[in-house]
């Protein structure tokens, strides 16, 4: 059954992408969506019936070279069973939502069939994430990461006619590629240390590993785990690597939801999966804690100044994931991995729901994303307003920010803050401020969109249409899944006990949450003119936050522009003059008649020559297979 779950999205992608001319455009959409729901249903069956004993389910042989032996296999344990449910269910609902959302997408010419390709991309992304979350060895983990990165690029660049889509896709590919490079180097380091890429072998070898410093006073294990952390931070859009996610929201809403929820959670999942390793490397865990706390604070600040609703949601996702990385980076012996085990799935569901609600808003406004022109949408989109308000309540009160959960489960809701204060008091204050900012940023989006009078021209507001039924049904189903996740979280965390911390520490997240909500209410409902007045009086600070502390600009000046100039120079001088000139000169001197022969044989058509090369390659491969390469 687990193997069927893994390959069902791949089957849906192949059917949608390759047979849509036969089964029709609508048939391709239903095929991809049907296979996604089939995988989701089976995932629920596996999770409910899971006995608690880890199983390794062989799929096929993959890599065998010397001591390197890595099969494609499914590691079925509590972590993977839970993540299979979350990935497949969220993806299936995103597929269903897309059937309504892409119905009249204006990025393409009328009559041009593009939807099957989009649904194939969604299904392939789901397949890649399932490879990642079920990995039994590090090579399979890297494979899932690489394929999901490629699919992220294709999904973001899907709307070819959108001005910033291609640039956003390239940025995502480059930033995630840096993370992938770090991941590969880290995996290579662990293989060098343990002579294996199997998770069980690596975990078993940890107590006996040599801790002698190799570089910068760090051991081989610390260096390897640090490189893997680099990859996880890049994928999860943490500070310094966060620049790709706001731009990636250029993707259509169903894709943006999966990228900002499922893909971003992939980095945290890797750390969660490799928990025994990070329990051994305190230095790297401290780095994880610092990066997570800094991201939560800075991304929360930046999100609070955005006017583009989709970019605001991108920064919110980075901030929320920063809180999760902070939990992962705290002392692993304190039980915070149990917090992460419910935070990550809940984050996926809530973030997906928020972005899909935002997609419904922008679709109603003909893809206008400026929140300053919204308002009053509760009248036009009552169901969307209800579901997004519910998602905001959960996001700001039930554990994603680890804030108001203290109201419902006082003994567990403030665990993160109690442990943070005990370990690093400065981090405690950073996380408390970040929790309040996260609450403010989310409710700011809700209030600007749905409450108060409409700020759009009357004709534009009158033209707003309600979302298709299929989109509303999707959001209703996500609401049920989200509330179920909340119940699951509270039940799971109720088994944990906090520290004997002062009462003011236990109350601090609740106070931060209330303060963030009250400020958002005051600024955007009670005194709607106040934000504009403050922005005018503090233009420098407001512009600094709106521009994201100019991180993109710094990268442009320090990295992108010099590399572009270097690439242009190498292309003009190295490729254009040196290589092309040398080849032309050698061809003219050493083989004067070769071009005539090629011209006579192939008529100068490059495709004919390429076909000959392909034919020769097929012949060589066939000969190797038949003879075993033995002469």
Residue ranges and their predicted role:
Residues 25-37, 168-180, 379-388, 465-477, ...:
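Alpha-helical transmembrane segments and their helix-start/interface "positive-inside/aromatic belt" motifs
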Residues 93-141, 151-464, 482-487:
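Hydrophobic transmembrane alpha-helices and their helix-loop junctions in integral membrane proteins
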């Amino acid at each position: 059954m687990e193997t069927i779950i893994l390959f069902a999205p791949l089957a849906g992608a192949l059917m949608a992408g390759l047979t849509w001319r036969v089964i029709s455009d609508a048939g391709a959409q239903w095929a991809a969506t049907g296979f996604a729901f089939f995988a989701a249903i089976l995932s629920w069956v596996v999770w409910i019936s899971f006995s608690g004993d880890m199983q390794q389910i062989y799929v096929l042989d993959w890599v065998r070279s010397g001591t390197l032996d890595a099969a494609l296999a499914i590691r079925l344990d509590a972590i993977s069973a839970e993540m299979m449910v979350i990935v497949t269910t969220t993806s299936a609902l995103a597929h269903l939502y897309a059937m309504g959302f892409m119905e009249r997408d204006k990025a393409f010419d009328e009559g041009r069939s593009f939807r099957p390709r989009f649904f194939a991309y969604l299904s392939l992304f789901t397949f890649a994430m399932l490879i990642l979350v079920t990995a039994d060895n590090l090579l399979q983990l890297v494979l899932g990461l690489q394929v999901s990165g490629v699919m992220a690029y294709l999904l973001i660049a899907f709307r070819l006619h959108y001005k910033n889509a291609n640039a956003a896709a390239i940025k995502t590919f480059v930033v995630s590629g840096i993370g992938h490079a770090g991941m590969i180097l880290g995996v290579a380091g662990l293989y060098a240390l343990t002579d294996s890429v199997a998770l069980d072998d690596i975990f078993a070898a940890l107590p006996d590993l040599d801790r002698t410093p190799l570089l910068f006073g760090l051991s081989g294990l610390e260096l390897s785990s640090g490189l893997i952390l680099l990859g996880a931070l890049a994928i999860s859009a943490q500070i310094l690597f966060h620049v790709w996610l706001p731009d990636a929201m250029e993707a259509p809403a169903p894709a943006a939801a999966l990228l900002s929820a499922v893909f971003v959670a992939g980095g945290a999942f890797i750390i969660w999966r490799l928990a025994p390793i990070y329990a051994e490397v305190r230095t790297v865990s401290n780095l994880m804690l610092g990066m997570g706390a800094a991201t939560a604070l800075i991304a929360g600040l930046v999100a609070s100044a955005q006017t583009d609703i989709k970019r605001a949601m991108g920064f919110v996702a980075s901030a929320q994931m920063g809180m999760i990385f902070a939990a992962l980076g705290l002392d692993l012996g304190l039980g915070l991995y149990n917090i992460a085990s419910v935070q990550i799935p809940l984050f996926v569901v809530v973030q997906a729901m928020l972005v899909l609600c935002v997609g419904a808003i922008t679709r109603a406004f003909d893809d206008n994303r400026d929140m300053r022109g919204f308002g009053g949408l509760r009248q036009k989109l009552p169901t969307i307003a209800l579901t997004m308000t519910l998602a905001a309540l959960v996001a700001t009160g039930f554990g994603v920010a680890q804030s108001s959960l203290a109201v419902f489960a006082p003994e567990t809701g403030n665990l993160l803050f109690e442990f943070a204060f005990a370990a690093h008091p400065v981090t405690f204050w950073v996380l408390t401020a970040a929790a309040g900012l996260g609450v403010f940023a989310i409710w700011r989006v809700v209030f600007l969109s749905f409450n108060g009078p409409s700020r759009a021209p009357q004709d534009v507001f009158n033209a707003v249409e309600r979302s298709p039924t299929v989109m509303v049904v999707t959001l209703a189903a996500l609401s049920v899944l989200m509330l179920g996740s909340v119940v699951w979280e509270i039940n799971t965390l109720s088994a944990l006990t906090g520290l004997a911390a002062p009462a003011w520490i236990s109350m601090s997240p609740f106070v931060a949450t209330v303060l963030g909500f009250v400020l958002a209410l005051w600024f955007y409902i009670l005194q709607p003119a106040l934000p504009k007045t403050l922005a005018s009086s503090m233009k420098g600070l407001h512009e600094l936050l709106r521009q994201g502390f100019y991180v993109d600009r710094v990268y442009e000046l320090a990295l992108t522009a010099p590399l572009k100039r270097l690439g242009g120079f190498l292309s003009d001088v190295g490729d254009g003059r040196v290589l092309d000139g040398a080849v032309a000169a050698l061809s003219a001197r050493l083989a004067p008649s070769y071009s005539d022969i090629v011209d006579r044989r192939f008529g100068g058509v490059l495709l004919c020559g390429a076909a000959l090369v392909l034919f020769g390659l097929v012949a060589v491969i066939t000969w190797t297979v038949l003879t075993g390469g033995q002469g």
